[in-house]
Regions:
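ATP-binding/phosphotransfer module of carbohydrate and carboxylate kinases, centering on a glycine-rich
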Residues: 14-199
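A short, polar/charged loop-to-alpha-helix boundary motif
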Residues: 2-16
């Protein structure tokens, strides 16, 4: 949590697709249902996000392309909000909640945004975020994150060799525990850390 009790939530960020709305209007269960309904021409859409996931998987009848695109839209809007957060906070990103089960359809568009470019007026391009973004769910990328880019440099103050991360990096990971369990584990670890500092 932050100094004022904020938990690092980005739901109130500006929505990249609908700039007058908050990000949660495109990054939520209801957003997946709305996006699917719009693409499939179903109004009102009474399906659940799980139904739409099953359609995307091909295990339920429906418009597979619309189902995949509805999750991709979520990933794109979430990616923009996450990019803004990563521009200010040097950390890792954990995707959680029930919708995380659809990560195979969410992560590609999210990673595309996070690995994208932004331009200046003169056409000069910059990486969307300063860090190299690794997909923790991909074994090769996980190994590269864990094993690559480290080198030793000599400290100008002590003269000792110290480890140096030559590439700024972060990960995008999907919670396997669910939001409640992950929150509980984080709170427990936070409490233990503070107890250690007080003893």
């Amino acid at each position: 949590t932050g100094d004022n009790g904020c938990g690092g939530d980005i739901w109130l960020s500006q929505n990249a697709k609908f700039p007058d709305l908050i990000a949660e209007e495109s990054v939520s269960k209801r957003a997946v249902v709305r996006a699917y309904g719009e693409r499939a021409g179903i109004n009102p859409c009474t399906l659940t996000p799980k139904d739409i996931f099953d359609i995307a998987e091909g295990t339920r009848d429906g418009n597979r392309l619309a189902a995949k695109e509805s999750f991709a839209e979520l990933g794109e809007v979430a990616g923009v909000a996450i990019a803004h957060a990563l521009d200010m906070i040097d950390g890792i990103v954990i995707i959680g909640g029930g919708i995380a089960g659809a990560s195979p359809y969410i992560l590609p568009s999210m990673l595309e945004v996070l690995r994208g470019k932004l331009a200046m007026m003169d056409g000069q391009l910059f990486d969307r975020v300063e860090m190299k973004v690794f997909n923790w769910e991909d074994r090769a990328e996980r190994n590269e994150f864990l094993n690559g880019h480290d080198q030793e440099v000599v400290s100008p103050i002590s003269g000792r060799k110290v480890p140096y991360h030559s590439v700024r990096r972060t990960i995008i990971a999907v919670s396997e525990d669910g939001a409640s369990t992950s929150t509980m584990k984080g709170a427990y670890a936070f409490a233990l850390m503070h107890m250690d500092h007080q003893s």
